[in-house]
Structures are given as structure tokens and as C-alpha cells.
Amino acid sequence: MENKSNSSQLPTALRLGNTVTTDKSMIIENFNKHFSTAGHAFRLATSTSANSSAPPAAPRPSLSRFSFTQIQIADVLKELQNLDPYKSAGLDNLDPLFLKLSATIVATPITSLFNLSFISSEIPKDWKAAAVIPLFKGGDTLDPNCYRPISILPCLSKVFESQVNKQVTDHLESHRTFSAVQSGFRAGHGCTSATLKVLNDIITAIDKRQYCAAVFIDLAKAFDSVNHHILIGRLSSLGFSDDCLAWFTNYFADRVQCVKSEGMLSGPLAVSMGVPQGSILGPTLFSVYINDVALAAGDSLIHLYADDTILYTFGPSLDTVLSNLQTSFNAIQHSFRGLQLLLNASKTKCMLFNRSLPAPACPTSITTLDGSDLEYVDVYKYLGVWLDCKLSFQTHIKHLQSKIKSRVGFLFRNKASFTQAAKLT
């Protein structure tokens, strides 16, 4: 229903470094080089991470050991029967439609293969190869940073990961290992619950005639930058058995990707960092990776949702509020550096929430560890909601009106093309 400008077609030219190429075979190779090294942003931008270490794991004295249990045929059969037949095949060319139609026949041997992976702590290499499609998201068509990589993994790897993810999340949730301020990719949590929690805290402070200041933290290529060694250490601290750790070590090893577009395929390149894009396990593993960052918030409040982090605090004195926020922000930055996650200072913003209290035209700057001043903004889009400094939601309402107007206009212009059944729905 939307007229989307995003395109998966290759550009006529692409710039990598100081070189611009128009040869399409070189364009897909350059895209692959760019996407496969996206997770190196921290290493390239930071010569040293001195005085920064990964945040300490929260104490969990009675955490039981976690080991994989055998996957059942009935569960695999259900997964296969629920496959979307219109999804693309991965580099193994195994079509989801074929697996769906043959589910009752292939479920048993596939289940045996999955369980053999647990026993051997090995995953077939074909399941660790991704086809990446560059999707233009706007801006300079020559700039590879203006393209979003859409990763297509083999269908069987996603079926397998779905079963693994259920076991992992059951263990994590049953032992309440996730922080209460972590809402990303958890059952019963979501953008709505996270936004409501933050807004409730801010509105409560405003109603008490207190100042409230927030930092909206943006990380550069966060999912692509996950350090596998640190993540394995996190899993170990959460009670994962040696066999599980060996399986996850193999899961990350020897991953490759190729760029695929317009019938062409680049050569494979190794991907040595990050959680696999498009995977089922990736979001859960990323939540594990950043979970204990919340411990560094100190006197401020924090909420985590995937790679969207808000740090905020309030009180009767603006100077004290900003001082506390700066102290907490420094500690959070050290934690992110310890995880080798790079702060995107240009996209990290500050906001003062205030309806009636006197406030200076130029409040005290909140600065990064590198000495850059963060920009104060009056409007910011947080988890899909446009927040303004007075919490009037006027900006959000205007965006909704514009979107509704556009979609109603589309329906009106194309009403003659709709079937009678479509019109009735």
C-alpha cells in the first residue's frame, strides 16, 4: 500500500574509498567488502580501549547449568509446515516451498541432523553462508553506507535456530537473567511496553515539578560489532555448559557471505564479527551481550531495547540533574567500549523534558569521552514514537496524520482496481 523508494537494484556506480566503479561485477564485490567489514567500526575508530572493560556480569549465585535437550520430530514438523512458501531460498538453493510440501517425509531425518549437531558441536558450513542483498535506503547512490544489507540464510538453519532459540530463551527467562530494563526481543515485552515505562517515569517527574534530562544513545553497527569471545564469556556466566559453549563457538566460526543481485553472485568473504543478520538466534544473543550495561547507569535510569538505549534522570535542580546524567553517561560509554561497541556521537542526542519550569536557553553540555558535545533537540523519534520536550505529542500526531492521508489517498486513487471482496474488507 505504500509507494516505497527503497530499491534492491544495483546502482550504476559505487564508490569504495577513493575509487568509483561502474562494472557491475565489481560493484557487488565492493558491496561485499563493505558489508563484511561493517563490524570493524570500533577497531578502526578506536586505537585503544584503555580504561574500558566489558561490564561485569550481574551476580547470579544459584543459576543452574544449561545444556541442549533433544529436539522432537513433532516440533520440527510443525516448523516445516508453518514455513512461508514465498520466502527466498538461501545459497543452498533449498526452497521453503519444497520443505513445506515434503514436511511429513523429511521431518524425521532433519530432526536427526539437528540433534547430531548438538552431539558433535558442529553446524554444517552451508548453513553458515548468507546471501546478502543491498537495499538502497536513500541518500547518495554512490555511497555504500546508504545501502542496507538484507541477509538471506538457508531455510534449514532458521528452522534449527528456532528450536535452539526456544531452549535458550526458556533458560534465560526462567532464571530471570535479563535485566528488568531490557525489553528487546522478549515475550511480553516490546516497543510499546518500553516506551510506556520511560514515558511514565518522565511524566511522573514532570508532575512533581522536577527537571528531567535524557540521552538517546545511538551505536554504530551494533549487531555487526559483537565480539564473539566476549559473548561466549557472557554465555558461560549464564550457566551454559561446555558442550553448549563449544556449539556456539562453532556457530560463529567460518561464517561467510556473498552479495547477490540481478542474477549475479559475488565471491564469498569471511564474517568474523557480529551476530548473523537475519538469524533467529541473533537478536537473543545481542540482548545477552548488552544486558549488563544497565549496571553502569548509577543514579540515572536506563532502558534497553535492542541497540536503542535511553539514559535519563530527574530532580529539583537542573545542574544536579545534568551532572548526574553526565556521570552516568560516562560510565555507560565505558561499558559500551568494553563491549567494543562504538558510540555514534552525531546521532546521540540530549533532550530536556520540561513544561513549566525555568530553563536556560543553552543548558550545560553533555559530552562524550572523546570531548564532543551532544546536540540538544526538542523532538526525537524513540522506538517509533516522536517525543517532544513538552510531551505534547503534536509532532507524532502530525506524522500519523500525514501517513494516514497518504494511505487513504492511495486507496482513493486505486479504488477502481480493487475487487469487490477487497472493497468490503
Name each model feature, range by range.
Residues L219-Y305, F314:
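Conserved polymerase palm-domain catalytic core
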